[in-house]
A protein has these predicted regions:
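Helix-loop-helix junctions within the multi-pass membrane cores of secondary transporters/permeases
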Residues: 12, 85-173, 177
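Alpha-helical transmembrane segments and their membrane-interface exit regions
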Residues: 63-67, 90-97, 183-187, 208-210, ...
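Residue-level signal for short hydrophobic patches within transmembrane helices
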Residues: 20-32, 57
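Membrane-embedded alpha-helical modules
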Residues: 137-223, 234
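The first (N-terminal) embedded transmembrane alpha-helix
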Residues: 28-41, 62-63
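Membrane-interfacial helix-loop connectors
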Residues: 47-48, 53-54, 58-93, 167
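C-terminal ends of transmembrane helices
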Residues: 97-106, 128-134, 186-193, 231-242
Length: 242
């Protein structure tokens, strides 16, 4: 029995080419919608005065749609660097929570591989990976392969936006902004349901609501992510100690 449990646990930590390719294929449908938003970003960045090369490089290295759109609002001859960094951090603070929830499965990887996987983590592949883990299936392939799919189509969409962005200048007008929200809601409903996840999300939600009420604007995203992330990190560490 112990050997079987150890074998099942080891399977959850698997990350190989087969699982990565499977993850790529599973995230392919949602990745196609990412092209539209990438094209919208390419157009918006062009209108903001960025060069074609810098636009594609930004999408390639940053891979953070909402943060990239927000950075365009601050773009100009004199870029307020501190404000830009703070804005990007606030928008992406949810990755602290994602990293905390993934910690139990990522910690067995070598550091280079672990951080390589985290470079392509976004909402969609994180949600699918967490659902897989909750069902006793390997999820790291979904995380890496799905992330590569999303990243590839984001960069491709950005490049297409340089030339054809006017066709999809406003994805929200076509209702496409609801696609990712509906996808994530479906993942949450079918995702992991245990005390650890309940406490993490409850703490994150409570801290975020308090910050929204009493702290400066937009700080609730950072506060909620840090609070939930710390709970997830501490709980994950305690589980592996015993």
């Amino acid at each position: 029995m112990a050997d079987e449990m150890a074998s099942n646990e080891a399977a959850l930590h698997r990350l190989d080419r087969t699982l990565t390719w499977q993850g790529f294929r599973e995230l392919l449908p949602i990745s196609l919608f990412v092209i539209v938003f990438g094209a919208a970003f390419g157009l918006a960045a062009t209108q903001a005065g960025l060069s074609d090369a810098s636009i594609v490089i930004m999408s390639t290295l940053v891979f953070a749609g909402a943060a990239q759109f927000a950075s365009l609002e601050l773009w100009g001859p004199h870029i307020p660097l501190f404000t830009l960094v703070l804005t990007v951090f606030a928008i992406n603070a949810r990755h602290l929570l994602m990293g905390a929830t993934l910690y139990p499965w990522l910690q067995s990887l070598q550091p280079a591989k672990r951080y390589g996987v985290m470079l392509v983590v976004s909402d969609a592949n994180w949600a699918m990976a967490m659902q897989a883990f909750s069902q006793g299936r390997p999820g790291l392939g979904l995380l890496l392969g799905g992330g590569i799919a999303l990243w590839s189509f984001w960069v491709l969409g950005t490049w297409l936006g340089l030339y054809f962005g006017n066709v999809v200048s406003d994805p929200a007008s076509l209702g496409l902004d609801m696609v990712m929200g509906c996808f994530l809601l479906a993942m949450v409903v079918g995702g992991e349901k245990n005390l650890r996840m309940l406490v993490i999300w409850a703490v994150a939600a409570g801290a975020s609501l308090l910050a929204y009420r009493y702290l400066p604007e937009n700080s609730h995203v950072v506060v909620g992510a840090i609070a939930g992330g710390l709970v997830g990190l501490f709980w994950g560490s305690r589980d592996h100690e015993y």
